[in-house]
Amino acid sequence: MTINGWIQILVFCGIIILLVKPLGGYMTRVFGGERTLLSPVLVPVERGLYRLAGTTEREEQHWTTYAASLLLFNLAGFLLLYMLQRFQGSLPFNPMGMSDVPADLAFNTTASFVTNTNWQNYGGESTMSYLTQMAGLTVQNFVSAATGVAIAIALIRAFSRKSMKTLGNFWVDLTRCTLYVLLPLCIILTLAFVSLGVPQTIGVYAEATTLEGARQVIALGPVASQLAIKMLGTNGGGFFNANSAHPFENPDAISNMIQMVAIFAIGASLTNVFGRMVGNERQGWAIFAAMGILFVAGVAICYWAEAAGNPLIHALSVDGGNMEGKETRFGIAMSALFAVVTTAASCGAVIAMHDSMMALGGMIPMINMMLGEIIIGGVGAGFYGIVLFVVVAVFVAGLMVGRTPEYLGKKIEAKEVKMAMLAVLCLPLSILGFTAIASVIPTGLASIANPGPHGFSEILYAYTSGTANNGSAFGGLSGNTPWYNITIGLAMLMGRFLVILPAMAIAGSLVAKKAAPQSAGTFPTTGPLFVGLLIGVILVVGGLIFFPALALGPIAEHLAMIKGQMF
């Protein structure tokens, strides 16, 4: 580890902390229907969209109606994207003549982008036409991110409102997030990326002659615009197969820092939106502190593991850390930081090959996802994910002091705890269930590239990434097979919607409750005691169940490596 590496990490953390309050304040005004700088331009567009949808901004929805609207919207998007891939060979904006996508891969890709996962069992520059990239994948990058934010806002309203039956309007929240938050920020990011050298074209691929006289085709496309929402919406699906390790997606250290900041910007700021909407910003900062402590701990361990390198190589008097699978223009510090950032949020973009990381270095991204990606998390998804743990934490606190659990004056009763645990337990059900099956059947084992614990880690990482809606992978797993396309697709759908529905049920229950005044026995939820309790609950309830699987994978691999055995 170097001072330069830690300075880069501290600069990133400082930028995020400085962004939380201004961006949080702006989003609070947007979802509160207040006037913003963009209102003169966007209000007419917003109202026109409401008229087309047959709704108004004043129309409110019960939680069941809100959830039904969300599910119908996502179903429509699923069908449209699937059909677009299946018939892309006959559609325009296909200058390179890409063929129709096979059914199992189209299902996997559709589930991936609709759920904000962006798991890719294909190479973007060799599989998808420009039309599919722009009208299919990029559109889902926007609306899947906006869907996550809408759920988070509905859940926040459940705490800020008292004795009501409605949580807002899904169509209004979706529209406002897209128009006022995602589009303006993406335009700024797109211009920044283009200025740094990222391509933005719908022309044919370029041709070049190498120094040896060979002909080389250089893939191009509308990269910058997709890159912007890929990062801001924590989608992660790359235009190119190499993702953000490709120089056309990530030319230099400046673009790399911008991309990492974009990944965390909205998720971190939602904690401030929460504090503002419930009338106590310290509540938001407490949640942000818990996220931040877990994040910094993960970065420190991952950076240490990668900087320490392989002990078997140390015996050859080679020092310099583990540079395998990393870009020299980024180095170990930025590669480790990016790996933790992309898995702490449900992004999945990569600048280094996670499969080439040291056993403990690769375990940290896996743990981030196993916790439900609530360390900042995806846009919206991270916030409503950590609120589920907040519900469990205050329930535990209530049991310890012998009082009915309360959070922000709302009583946390059996229904809320059951729904929270249902959502929390769906992750291990999917991850461990699919991993167990794939680890014993020939179809599952045929796709792994390495024997022993590392091969098991490849399978475990794949289902963890899919269920947690991340999308990154251990590249040694050949995932483009009918088995993995279908099962990982199902894991992605389970990880998205089996968490959303319990979260919406909790919101519907809480919004109808009165807020009790604070008393001397009320458990404080803005101090270090609550932050520590929340972190403990996250690690014990969310993480401990995965320890046996981790022991069979990365931990066993690390111990074997110490003894001189590699896989």
UniProtKB/Swiss-Prot annotation:
Any single Gene Ontology cellular-component annotation: plasma membrane
Q: Its topology with respect to the membrane? A: Multi-pass membrane protein
Q: Which residues cross the membrane?
A: 5-25, 64-84, 136-156, 179-199, 254-274, 285-305, 332-352, 359-376, 421-441, 486-506, 529-549
Where located?
Cell inner membrane
Question: Which residue positions does the secretion signal occupy?
Answer: none
**Assigned keywords, A-Z:** Cell inner membrane, Cell membrane, Ion transport, Membrane, Potassium, Potassium transport, Transmembrane, Transmembrane helix, Transport
- Superkingdom of origin organism: Bacteria
Q: Identify a single GO molecular function assigned to this protein.
A: potassium ion binding
**InterPro entries per the UniProt record, alphabetical:** KdpA
User: Subunit structure of this entry?
Assistant: The system is composed of three essential subunits: KdpA, KdpB and KdpC.
Q: Note the HAMAP family from the entry.
A: KdpA (MF_00275)
Provide the function of this protein.
Part of the high-affinity ATP-driven potassium transport (or Kdp) system, which catalyzes the hydrolysis of ATP coupled with the electrogenic transport of potassium into the cytoplasm. This subunit binds the periplasmic potassium ions and delivers the ions to the membrane domain of KdpB through an intramembrane tunnel.
The text of the family note is:
Belongs to the KdpA family.
Xref: NCBIfam families: kdpA (TIGR00680)
What is the protein's given name? Answer: Potassium-transporting ATPase potassium-binding subunit
Q: Which organism is it from?
A: Brucella anthropi (strain ATCC 49188 / DSM 6882 / CCUG 24695 / JCM 21032 / LMG 3331 / NBRC 15819 / NCTC 12168 / Alc 37)
